[in-house]
């Protein structure tokens, strides 16, 4: 409700100070984390967190550097997949009764990091394929931010019509909609995918 950015900054500092005093007086060990501003929008949102096994949020926290963020907005510092020096041609492998990354890794005797997992979401009534490493999961809050909201996972009964495959066999090859790949796949090649 401030009339200027300077006033907003001052109000923010006063609220921050008040919260810190409350937590200090309660004797709570707390930390401030970057957070999603949610439906209100905007930037620079922060939350005060107290470590607890009975909370509703999960926080990424680094004791050595002090970085802390709600997992909805946490930035990954995990290395990308290393590129093989020689790119192989695309080829098909029959994987009968294989319906998950774990089953695929067991069947092919490979590591999850060699797999590119696909998930299909619907954005404004159009399919979008999300491609990530086999051991990763989609962060739907970040996906909504990238796509601009109005996003939902495709229903199981929609998958065959959209991709021609069942949930455990979907891949990017031949997919006709938009594809969004995780940054960790930036230079990856020779991956196994549905």
What do the PLM-derived regions correspond to, one by one?
Residues 1-194:
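Extended, low-hydrophobicity, polar/charged segments
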């Amino acid at each position: 409700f401030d009339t200027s950015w300077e006033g907003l900054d001052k109000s923010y500092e006063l609220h921050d100070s008040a919260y810190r005093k409350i937590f200090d007086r309660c004797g709570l060990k707390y930390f401030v984390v970057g957070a999603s501003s949610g439906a209100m929008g905007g930037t620079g949102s922060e939350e005060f967190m107290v470590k607890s096994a009975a909370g509703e949020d999960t926080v990424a926290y680094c004791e050595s550097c002090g970085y802390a963020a709600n997992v909805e907005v946490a930035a990954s510092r995990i290395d990308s997949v290393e590129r093989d020096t020689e790119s192989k041609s695309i080829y098909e492998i029959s994987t009968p009764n294989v319906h998950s990354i774990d089953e695929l890794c067991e069947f092919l005797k490979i590591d999850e990091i060699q797999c590119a997992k696909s998930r299909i979401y619907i954005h404004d009534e159009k399919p979008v394929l999300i491609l990530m490493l086999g051991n990763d999961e989609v962060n739907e809050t970040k996906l909504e931010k990238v796509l601009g909201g109005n996003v939902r996972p495709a229903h199981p009964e929609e998958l065959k019509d959209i991709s021609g495959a069942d949930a455990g066999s979907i891949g990017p090859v031949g997919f006709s909609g938009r594809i969004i790949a995780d940054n960790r796949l930036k230079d990856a090649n020779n991956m196994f995918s549905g």
